[in-house]
Amino acid sequence: MSSALSIRQLTKTYGNGFQALSGIDLDVAEGDFFALLGPNGAGKSTTIGILSTLVNKTSGTVNIFGHDLDKSPAALKRSIGVVPQEFNFNQFEKTFDIVVTQAGYYGIPAKVAKERAEQYLTQLGLWDKRDVPSRSLSGGMKRRLMIARALVHEPRLLILDEPTAGVDIELRRSMWTFLTELNEKGITIILTTHYLEEAEQLCRNIGIIDHGTIVENTSMRNLLGQLHVETFLLDLKNNLSVAPQLLGYPSRLV
């Protein structure tokens, strides 16, 4: 299987001397749904920033679909769509216009840009909000707007940095469904998250990053097989007639 992303010995040291990345090696196959899991400060966002050309690497190589970051940054950037963690669009611009404007940055003709904006806003449940300023959208709607904007130039690789942060459970699951359908159409997806449950639901392979280093890179199946089952002993005042449901862990009470 061909490679969508290949990273070799990637490092990043900031001006204050803080080393955010310490020689990362990472491969993501074309068509994969890949999770990059780690705590705050682990290096996830720095890695995404380098891939999206917003952060300059210190050393190492990055190759996306055959495009080298140093030799062909424009072609590399065109092949990816990035959904950042923070909202970074004009809060006074209309929802529809935000997506169309993004398409223009990639030289997409206006007619095609408008058709794609309608397509993705409809798929993400935002078409009825097309004429309202983005500032009036809820947090979940803004997340979906950023996904539509990232997809409008039809990238081969979609990178999402904590896309469901602050999103309620119902909306989170609808976004999971949409992303799964995208991946089934052949788009390679890299997802950064804090949540193992999210990675388990969506991803086939996973890399775990901590203190700027990849500490695990394996299939989701292998990782879950390595996890130990923890047993909790509860001393209850009264007997229970039925076992309680553990929210977030359906059918896992043993």
Locations of regions flagged by a protein language model:
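A short, flexible loop at the N-terminus of ABC-type nucleotide-binding domains that lies
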Residues: 1-7, 11-23, 73
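Conserved ABC ATPase "signature" region
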Residues: 100, 104, 111-129
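Conserved ABC transporter NBD signature motif
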Residues: 60-68, 75-76
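A short, proline-enriched helix->beta-strand linker immediately N-terminal to the Walker B motif
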Residues: 152-156
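ABC transporter nucleotide-binding domain
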Residues: 176-254
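Hydrophobic anchor residue at the start of the ABC signature
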Residues: 147
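Catalytic Walker B motif of ABC-type/P-loop ATPase nucleotide-binding domains
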Residues: 158-161
